[in-house]
Amino acid sequence: MASVQGLIKIVAITGGVWLSGKITAHSLVSVPALLQTRSADGLSPCTILRVWRRIYEQGHRHSPQIAACTSTAFAYLAWCASDRTPRLLYGTAACSVMGIVPYTLLFMGPTNSRLLERSAAEEEKVPGATRGEDMVNVPSEMTTEELLSHWRFLAGIRGLLPLAGGILGLFAALYSNEGAR
């Protein structure tokens, strides 16, 4: 029978890796598909922004809570660790996973704000936005496609934080199991 601590290890490691996949999927799949649809099918910036905003809202709604639960599990494992190495690895894993929050605020915040402002402005002028023209009345030197490409890059980096946490947690678990033999 598995111990509670063993189950927490599984939840923490899987949570970090799963969250990384969730975040990275937007960078590697969703946004490239939007950009390709824009260029290949002539979809309007309004529609592209509307879909991006829904993707963003789903991530914004769930990712911080998943990161908090995963980080809490790693912090608990660090607190329970009797040896210094797993304690440091689990502690670093907790910080790495929770690092998506300050990373998002500091590095992605300006791009998120521009895209959300542009999306709101496009929503207000929906009848004219369906012609496939990019906005000219939002103060920004970047086009919608450039902003989305930049967001894609930043989100790709963001996805590495929980992945690093999951890998560090796995190393800590393996180190702990090796020491138990």
UniProtKB/Swiss-Prot annotation:
Keywords: Membrane, Monooxygenase, Oxidoreductase, Transmembrane, Transmembrane helix. Endocrocin is specifically produced in conidia. Disruption phenotype: Leads to unstable anthrone production and abolishes the production of endocrocin. Its EC number is 1.-.-.-. The chain crosses the membrane at residues 1-21, 65-81, 88-108, 153-173. It is found in: Membrane. One of its GO terms (molecular function) is monooxygenase activity. The gene is encC. The keyword rRNA processing does not apply. GO terms for cellular component: membrane. Anthrone oxygenase; part of the gene cluster that mediates the biosynthesis of endocrocin, a simple anthraquinone interesting for many biotechnological applications. The pathway begins with the synthesis of atrochrysone thioester by the polyketide synthase (PKS) encA. The atrochrysone carboxyl ACP thioesterase encB then breaks the thioester bond and releases the atrochrysone carboxylic acid from encA. The atrochrysone carboxylic acid is then converted to endocrocin anthrone which is further oxidized into endocrocin by the anthrone oxygenase encC. It is a multi-pass membrane protein. Induction: Expression is positively regulated by the transcription factors brlA and laeA. This is Anthrone oxygenase encC. One of its GO terms (biological process) is endocrocin biosynthetic process. The lineage of its organism: Eukaryota, Fungi, Dikarya, Ascomycota, Pezizomycotina. Endocrocin and related anthraquinones compounds have interesting activities for medicinal uses, including anti-inflammatory activity. Belongs to the anthrone oxygenase family. InterPro entries: Anthrone_oxy (IPR013901). The keyword Chaperone does not apply. It comes from Aspergillus fumigatus (strain ATCC MYA-4609 / CBS 101355 / FGSC A1100 / Af293) (Neosartorya fumigata). Disulfide bonds: none annotated. Its main location: membrane. Pfam families: Anthrone_oxy (PF08592).
